[in-house]
């Protein structure tokens, strides 16, 4: 157990008829042959790391000590996975939105996927620039299928290390497809996104001033260990387990002492994702 110092469906819509569209590639068993994302494009893709450590005084938000450790660890991890990593530090909310808009307008046609890591203060549905909050929905909307066509049908991963509220978890003891196919398919604009949150809705997310955040430490370790063996959702389940079991806060303030954390994965992926091919 880690003991280092830690910081802290719609009732108004009438029933509509639906139709089932059967895929063109299938087996007699009904299982689709095209179950995993194509990851053998010429490039793996971009990995944008936004690392906000220092904040304007008038925001009242503290310096995020230990976040540089996370940023360095993430850069090494995704560079080893052949991503083009771009680190950005201490961005305002306007700069974050400008960056995301700019990246979404790039040509991703030769890229397999897209990753964005957000390291900052936060609250439910928001991430903080150095001068104030940004709605996550607005930030990620630039990459929807109808906005960023060269990433349509490709996995878009958002990794978010930030608080989602002020609740504290005290814990409890326990016993124990082809390109031709894609051209004729219509998919939801919100498809193929995955959000990996460091903590559950409403809760604090813990960070160690020396070793970095519990979530990013665990994520990087799991990727290094399992990336050539397991599918992404299986890897993230290992991350959940590691954070839940191996970490606990240590503080001289009893309010914040012996607290736990569980990451939260929200997936709209439509296929399995293997980083190897």
Swiss-Prot record:
Main location group: cytoplasm
GO cellular component assignments: cytoplasm; death-inducing signaling complex; nucleus
PTM info: Cleavage by granzyme B, caspase-6, caspase-8 and caspase-10 generates the two active subunits. Additional processing of the propeptides is likely due to the autocatalytic activity of the activated protease. Active heterodimers between the small subunit of caspase-7 protease and the large subunit of caspase-3 also occur and vice versa.
Pfam families tied to this protein: Peptidase_C14 (PF00656)
Alphabetized GO MF terms: cysteine-type endopeptidase activity; endopeptidase activity; enzyme activator activity
Propeptide, chain numbering: 1-9, 10-28
Enzymatic class: hydrolase
GO terms under biological process: apoptotic process; erythrocyte differentiation; execution phase of apoptosis; keratinocyte differentiation; neuron differentiation; positive regulation of amyloid-beta formation; positive regulation of neuron apoptotic process; proteolysis
Location within or outside the cell: Cytoplasm
UniProt note on regulation of activity: Inhibited by BIRC6; following inhibition of BIRC6-caspase binding by DIABLO/SMAC, BIRC6 is subjected to caspase cleavage, leading to an increase in active caspases.
Phosphoserine sites (modified residues): 26
Residues with the N-acetylmethionine modification: 1
Modified residues (N6-acetyllysine): 11
Active site per database record: 121, 163
Residue positions where S-nitrosocysteine is found in the record: 163
Catalytic activity: Strict requirement for an Asp residue at positions P1 and P4. It has a preferred cleavage sequence of Asp-Xaa-Xaa-Asp-|- with a hydrophobic amino-acid residue at P2 and a hydrophilic amino-acid residue at P3, although Val or Ala are also accepted at this position
Assembly: Heterotetramer that consists of two anti-parallel arranged heterodimers, each one formed by a 17 kDa (p17) and a 12 kDa (p12) subunit. Interacts with BIRC6/bruce. (Microbial infection) Subunit p17 interacts with African swine fever virus (ASFV) inhibitor of apoptosis protein.
Function of the protein: Involved in the activation cascade of caspases responsible for apoptosis execution. At the onset of apoptosis, it proteolytically cleaves poly(ADP-ribose) polymerase PARP1 at a '216-Asp-|-Gly-217' bond. Cleaves and activates sterol regulatory element binding proteins (SREBPs) between the basic helix-loop-helix leucine zipper domain and the membrane attachment domain. Cleaves and activates caspase-6, -7 and -9 (CASP6, CASP7 and CASP9, respectively). Cleaves and inactivates interleukin-18 (IL18). Triggers cell adhesion in sympathetic neurons through RET cleavage.
Family according to the record: Belongs to the peptidase C14A family.
Protein name in UniProt: Caspase-3
Species per Swiss-Prot/TrEMBL record: Sus scrofa
